[in-house]
Curated annotation (Swiss-Prot):
Keyword annotations from UniProtKB, A to Z: Cell inner membrane, Cell membrane, Ion transport, Membrane, Potassium, Potassium transport, Symport, Transmembrane, Transmembrane helix, Transport
Subcellular localization, as worded in the UniProt entry: Cell inner membrane
Membrane spanning residue stretches: 12-32, 52-72, 101-121, 138-158, 166-186, 213-233, 249-269, 286-306, 338-358, 370-390, 396-416, 420-440
GO terms of molecular function: potassium ion transmembrane transporter activity; symporter activity
Name of the protein in its database record: Probable potassium transport system protein Kup 2
GO CC entries: plasma membrane
Family: Belongs to the HAK/KUP transporter (TC 2.A.72) family.
Catalytic activity, as annotated: K(+)(in) + H(+)(in) = K(+)(out) + H(+)(out)
Membrane topology field: Multi-pass membrane protein
Function: Transport of potassium into the cell. Likely operates as a K(+):H(+) symporter.
InterPro entries: K+_transporter, K_trans_C, K_trans_N, Kup
Keyword Ion transport included in the entry's annotation: yes
């Protein structure tokens, strides 16, 4: 590590604490409370308290520390993490088409579950913090939901302005949060150090063996202690592997463990504190500041999830899983700071509906977990493929490591499945809707490409037929998704105007399996006959296409483009659903609606609107 990197490391680590660990860092607000006082409460006995604490501790060790920090964070896609980055990494190396198809569906479903999860996290986090007002005085109970709705509304309304300015406070606030978590827990452990016996895995094993039914019910809520663990991998591209690991081992994990064990120590002495063990750790004089700090921490956790949803939306668009949407860059300095209006308002409506419909954090906890455990299960399957295809691990070792992690994931997923009638149906339903949208768009675009390929003619035949066509001054650029053949917009233009520009460029944008593409590898320019050339522009799945910027790079290849002498011809497809094609009628209609409402190509590719000619074409699918 360079001296410059060493100097920057503390700042990066603090910034990572502010973004990466918000979700898992606010879990102490409700995790133990839900285990002992939720929809499937465990009796508050010393034996059960120690058994549950042991389960929580070893869940953090196995699912977060070993699985994500030690193993999955090694599977980065040029520094980027997350289910879609992992999907791109695996499909790039899967030679078997059927295997590649299965892996792709798994990755898409993981992304779909993430959308379901991202609706619940802001609702349960902020609501659980504001519920601390009830501890101060029960008279404030009626204000909890209005205050929560007000905070969430403010949070979603400021997204379009970006969070760069206030984002600088996220790290220090979360450092203070984790520091207080540790202090409150340590204070209570000092009164009852016997609680540390639960660090021994035998307590978890005995609890599971002697109270199998209770342990199974407990697992459904124990998972609340590890929700957000997947964010360590998802946010790796923003901060790097080492700062996240340093923050986890050096500060965040010890603070979480101390707080959970502090709550356990409190319950051993005062079982009646189970109504809100987290806030009962604080002295009476500190309750109001604690509610304020907890609310700030949950807002930061929610912001991280919202930003993650924007990032996944952009990845999905680039990977051909969603139609073009408006993507606004909210920072001139940071490429990753974006705002996706459709995603923002969809999440907002869902989050508000959840708060109003479920009414308290305990009810929401029943809905939480199923999406997270589903995502974790899929991540384990995908990383098993990475172990075989990329790391070339011995298959016996893969079976041992991945098999053990799969068993743990399946146990947690099964325990959460019993919560489906109580609220778990919501993230699953939202995940299913998202999965349907993602796969419908992917399938529809493939059918459109196939239909356009049928209607196209070979470039060689076209070039031979244009000798007598009148050529006019200037440059015409035709955007096309096909790497060969003649774009429909070019044929339509020639048919109606009977002329061609003296220079014609066919531009195809490709998305790679990597998060970014170096400018040296951005473009491929192929000169053909009679003033025609084909330009391939490559972008990573974390980048936003910029065609004028790509044309600037052509200077290095001897081609210059003057925007005032250049006309962009774009094809606007009108989709006509058909009963006779390879898609169910309702899905064809859904695809047609998505296609109609997609952001215009000129906006998405940053093409000057005063230089655009749009030509319509009708396609039957």
């Amino acid at each position: 590590m360079s001296s410059h990197s060493k100097q920057a490391l503390p700042a990066i680590t603090v910034a990572a604490i502010g973004v990466v660990f918000g979700d898992i860092g606010t879990s102490p607000l409700y995790a133990l409370k839900e285990i002992f006082n939720g929809h499937h409460p465990i009796p508050v006995t010393p034996e059960n308290i120690l058994g549950v604490l042991s389960l929580v501790f070893w869940a953090i060790i196995v699912l977060v520390t070993i699985k994500y920090v030690a193993i999955i964070m090694r599977a980065d896609n040029r520094g980027e993490g997350g289910s879609l980055a992992l999907l791109a990494l695996v499909t790039e190396r899967a030679k078997n088409p059927r295997l590649s198809w299965i892996i792709t569906l798994l990755g898409i479903f993981a992304a779909a579950l993430f959308y379901g999860d991202s609706m619940i996290t802001p609702a349960i986090s902020v609501l659980s913090a504001v519920e601390g007002l009830e501890i101060i005085t029960p008279d404030l109970k009626s204000y909890v939901i209005p205050i929560t709705l007000g905070i969430l509304t403010g949070l979603f309304f400021i997204q379009k302005h970006g969070t760069g300015a206030v984002g600088k406070l996220f790290g220090p606030v979360m450092v203070a949060w984790f520091g207080i978590l540790a202090i409150l827990g340590l204070k209570e452990i000092a009164y009852n150090p016997a609680v540390l016996l639960a660090l021994n895995p035998l307590f978890a094993i005995v609890f599971v063996a002697e109270h199998t039914g209770l342990a199974f019910l407990a697992l459904g809520s124990v998972v609340l202690a590890v929700t957000g663990g997947e964010a360590l991998y998802t946010d790796m591209g923003h901060f790097g592997r080492f700062p996240i690991r340093l923050a986890w081992f050096g500060f965040v994990m010890p603070a979480l463990v101390l707080n959970y064990f502090g709550q356990g120590a409190l319950l051993l002495i005062e079982p009646e504190a189970i109504a809100s063990p987290f806030f009962h750790l604080a002295p009476d004089w500190a309750l109001i500041p604690m509610v304020g700090l907890a609310t700030a921490a949950t807002v930061i956790a929610s912001q991280a999830v919202i930003s993650g949803a924007f990032s996944v939306a952009r990845q999905s668009i680039q990977m051909g899983l969603l139609p073009r949407m408006q993507i606004i860059h909210t920072s001139g300095m940071e490429e990753g700071q974006i705002y996706v209006p459709f995603t923002n308002w969809s999440l907002y409506l869902a989050v508000i509906a959840l708060v109003i419909g479920f009414k308290n954090s305990s009810n929401l906890a029943a809905a939480y977990g199923i999406a997270v455990t589903g995502t974790m299960l899929i991540d384990t399957i995908l990383v098993a493929f990475v172990m075989v295809l990329m790391w070339k691990w011995n298959k016996l070792l893969v079976a041992l490591v991945a098999g053990t992690l799969l068993l743990v994931d399946i146990a947690f997923f099964a325990a959460n499945a019993i919560k489906i009638p109580e609220g778990g149906w919501f993230p699953l339903a939202m995940g299913l809707v998202s999965f349907t949208v993602l796969t419908t768009w992917r399938r529809g675009r493939r059918m459109v490409s196939e239909e356009m390929a049928k209607q196209s003619i070979p470039m060689s035949d076209f070039l031979q037929s244009i000798d007598d066509v009148h050529r006019i001054y200037g440059t015409a650029i035709f955007m096309t998704s096909a790497k060969d053949g003649v774009p429909p917009a070019l044929l339509h233009n020639l048919k109606h105007n009977q002329v061609l520009h003296e220079r014609v460029v066919l531009v195809t944008v490709q998305t790679t399996d990597t998060p970014t593409v170096n400018d040296m590898e951005r473009i491929y320019l192929h000169r053909m006959q009679k003033g025609f050339m084909r330009l391939i522009v490559r972008y990573g799945f974390m980048e936003s296409p910029d065609i004028p910027g790509a044309l600037e790079l052509c200077k290095g290849h001897g081609e210059r483009f003057d925007m005032m002498e250049t006309t962009f011809y774009l094809s606007r497809e009108t989709i006509v659903p058909s009963m006779a094609r390879g898609m169910l009628p309702w899905r064809a209609r859904l695809f047609a609606v998505m296609s109609k409402n997609a952001t215009s190509a000129s906006d998405f590719f940053h093409i000057p609107t005063n230089r655009v000619v749009e030509l319509g074409t009708q396609l039957v699918i």
